[in-house]
């Protein structure tokens, strides 16, 4: 175009700023990535937003609005360009609010803008939409309070162009061809029209031809999107001084400008002024805050909060910790009293989601102070009686954390030494208990009598389940794991069970007991100690490469340290001992003889054992061991017998 005289009236170009629209799913995904993937890494990560395609704009698109949601972090294909245009960039998610505040915002914006400037200086980049339209977002996630601080920037380079005229008449003849190009071709935001041809390459631009900018907003004033700035700067750098420019809009409100560059104000060898930080609704510069605590479903908040502390372990302390294997465990707790209450709470703390209680007792007035899953009202709420422990414990867990899958069964476990007096009922209890073992991965034995643990011990080994045991004394406790049979290991190396040190089968220990013998008389803190150690032993076992087959002993290469066999604690001198005992081939609960007989006869074997402990001792070989011991004792005493003739010798 011909040059314009210096006396021509000039008018500065006004632009419509870009706005961001961030859906809550964007922050939900960001928090997930921060916990699981980014962790302490605050380097830039790719993101993308999407802008409504210019041919789809309507009266509500008075600002160019970039949308961000959960898909902004996807690394897959871009959005459908027929409806939306991808806008790519980076997120810088810092680790502290102080770091967010202390970052020099102007300096970092200049750095981002300089990246665009350097690409222009390089000269090898044409006016690609992706190159000249970048988004950057500075963010900080307060994951405990669900508050997200963020500030979007859309870097733009300034150049001193002025409006010196308009040409509405010439505009009309170009609109049809531009409209057809926008409607049918891949999106190009800035190009030149040369005899009806679309020219996209900067090297082919001619000053005498008309430039076209496809606007991404329909502002009522003639103020194009601020995206135009970067394209105008390219033209200024390439030596264009006077241009004709059409700002195309799909609603028929396009306009035609004649622009002139004030080249005296253009710094040839310096980075231009850079702007781009998004402003607040009041027009001031500043970051935004998204407080999702009141928007997210409380149950979802609880779910995320439970996982938060666990996932933070993986940031520095235990990066290889396998939380999924813990979360997916199905845990059966036999006993819903003091031990059951504390064990279940510790399991939930580790993220276990599936917990089942078995107990046959009701809540009494003495229970709530020691058993934290129960309260005073539970002692009389069932028609004057206490509620069933197992059922109430399961419901309490759901009240504490709604996402937990918790069930309770009022079930009496058949006990060795207690003869069968109602076979139908006890057989039903046995069948139900057997089914529960099938449906769970790990079993905790938390009952208050020795004989009640026998059948679960047998079932655990027969069904190859992880079994952990916790037992209390007045000022002592035992926590142990039972050994499991593995085809890969010699059974001789299997660690023992609760009964492996016994030379007699367990028997009735509940009959004819005084009150202090019937109640659990133990120092209150002992149960907490035993419960926590039992759960931690279980978690350490899951992190071991060999899981329940792990051999006891120290190791420096394990995620959570060693996996002992037994832990015995004593409060009278505040000591703990780690012990290891092998399985006993004549054990009344885990010996091969018992397991083989149980697998062969099932309930019939159990019934015979319940009715006659001698039958069990004969099956496992303990009876023969006892007889041999008696015989050896008799022989020893016989050797020590003195004849009358020897009396004088001994007396001398």
Swiss-Prot record:
Pfam families, sorted: ATG7_N (PF16420), ThiF (PF00899)
Family the entry assigns: Belongs to the ATG7 family.
Catalytic center residues: 519 (glycyl thioester intermediate)
Motif (GXGXXG motif): 335-340
Subcellular locations according to the entry: Cytoplasm; Preautophagosomal structure
Domain notes: The GxGxxG motif is important for the function, possibly through binding with ATP.
Job description of the protein: E1-like activating enzyme involved in the 2 ubiquitin-like systems required for cytoplasm to vacuole transport (Cvt) and autophagy. Activates ATG12 for its conjugation with ATG5 and ATG8 for its conjugation with phosphatidylethanolamine. Both systems are needed for the ATG8 association to Cvt vesicles and autophagosomes membranes. Autophagy is essential for maintenance of amino acid levels and protein synthesis under nitrogen starvation.
Protein name (record): Ubiquitin-like modifier-activating enzyme ATG7
MF (Gene Ontology): Atg12 activating enzyme activity; Atg8 activating enzyme activity; identical protein binding
Biological process according to GO: autophagosome assembly; autophagy of mitochondrion; cellular response to nitrogen starvation; cytoplasm to vacuole targeting by the Cvt pathway; piecemeal microautophagy of the nucleus; protein modification by small protein conjugation
């Amino acid at each position: 175009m011909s040059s314009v005289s210096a006396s021509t009236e000039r008018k500065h170009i006004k632009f419509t700023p870009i706005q961001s629209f961030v859906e809550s799913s964007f922050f939900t995904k960001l928090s997930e990535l921060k916990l699981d993937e980014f962790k302490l890494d605050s380097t830039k990560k790719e993101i993308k937003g999407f802008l409504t395609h210019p041919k789809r704009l309507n009266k509500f698109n008075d600002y160019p609005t970039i949308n961000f949601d959960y898909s902004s972090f996807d690394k897959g294909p871009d959005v459908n360009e027929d409806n939306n245009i991808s806008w790519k960039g980076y997120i810088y998610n810092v680790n502290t609010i102080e770091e967010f505040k202390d970052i020099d915002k102007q300096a970092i914006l200049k750095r981002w803008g300089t990246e665009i400037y350097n690409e222009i200086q390089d000269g090898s980049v044409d006016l690609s939409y992706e190159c000249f339209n970048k988004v950057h977002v500075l963010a900080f996630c307060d994951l405990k309070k669900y508050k997200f601080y963020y500030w979007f920037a859309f870097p733009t380079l300034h150049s001193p162009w002025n409006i010196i005229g308009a040409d509405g008449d010439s505009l009309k003849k170009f609109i049809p061809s531009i409209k057809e190009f926008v409607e049918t071709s891949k999106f190009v935001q800035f190009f030149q029209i040369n005899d009806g041809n679309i020219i996209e390459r900067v090297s082919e631009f001619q000053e005498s031809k008309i430039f076209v900018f496809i606007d991404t907003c329909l502002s009522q004033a003639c103020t194009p999107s601020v995206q135009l700035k970067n394209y105008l700067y390219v033209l200024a750098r390439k030596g264009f001084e006077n241009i004709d420019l059409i700002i195309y809009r799909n609603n028929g409100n396009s306009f035609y400008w004649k622009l002139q560059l004030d080249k005296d104000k253009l710094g040839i060898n310096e980075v231009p002024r850079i702007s781009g930080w998004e402003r607040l609704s009041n027009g001031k510069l500043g970051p935004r805050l998204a407080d999702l605590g009141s928007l997210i479903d409380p149950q979802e908040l609880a779910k995320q909060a439970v996982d938060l502390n666990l996932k933070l372990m993986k940031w520095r302390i235990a990066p290889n910790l396998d939380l999924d294997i813990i979360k997916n465990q199905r845990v059966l707790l036999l006993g819903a009293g003091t031990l059951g209450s504390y064990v279940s709470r510790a399991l939930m703390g580790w993220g276990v989601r599936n917990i089942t209680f078995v107990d046959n007792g009701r809540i009494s007035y003495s229970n709530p102070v020691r058993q934290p899953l129960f309260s005073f009202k539970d002692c009389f709420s069932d028609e004057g009686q206490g509620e069933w422990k197992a059922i109430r414990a399961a419901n309490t867990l759901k009240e504490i954390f709604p996402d937990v899958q918790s069930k309770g069964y009022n079930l009496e476990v058949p006990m060795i030494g207690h003869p069968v007096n109602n076979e139908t009922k006890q057989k039903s209890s046995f069948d139900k208990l057997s089914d529960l073992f099938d449906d769970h991965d790990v079993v905790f034995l938390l009952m208050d009598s020795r004989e009640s643990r026998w059948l679960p011990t047998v079932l655990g080994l027969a069904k190859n389940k992880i079994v952990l045991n916790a037992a209390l004394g007045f000022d002592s406790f035992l926590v142990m794991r039972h050994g499991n049979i593995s085809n890969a290991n010699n059974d001789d190396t299997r660690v023992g069970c609760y009964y492996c040190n016994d030379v007699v089968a367990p028997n009735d220990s509940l009959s004819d007991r005084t009150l202090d013998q019937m109640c659990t008389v133990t120092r209150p803190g002992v149960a907490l100690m035993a419960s926590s150690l039992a759960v931690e032993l279980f978690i350490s076992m899951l992190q071991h490469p060999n899981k329940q087959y792990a051999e006891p002993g120290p190791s420096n290469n394990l995620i959570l340290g060693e996996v002992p066999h037994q832990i015995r604690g004593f409060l009278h001198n505040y000591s703990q001992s780690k012990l290891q005992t092998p399985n006993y081939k004549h054990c009344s609960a885990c010996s091969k003889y018992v397991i083989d007989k149980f697998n062969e006869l099932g309930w019939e074997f159990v019934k015979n054992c319940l009715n006659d402990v001698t039958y069990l001792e004969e099956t496992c070989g303990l009876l023969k061991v006892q007889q041999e011991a008696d015989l050896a004792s008799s022989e020893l005493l016989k050797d020590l017998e003195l004849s009358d003739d020897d009396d004088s010798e001994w007396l001398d």
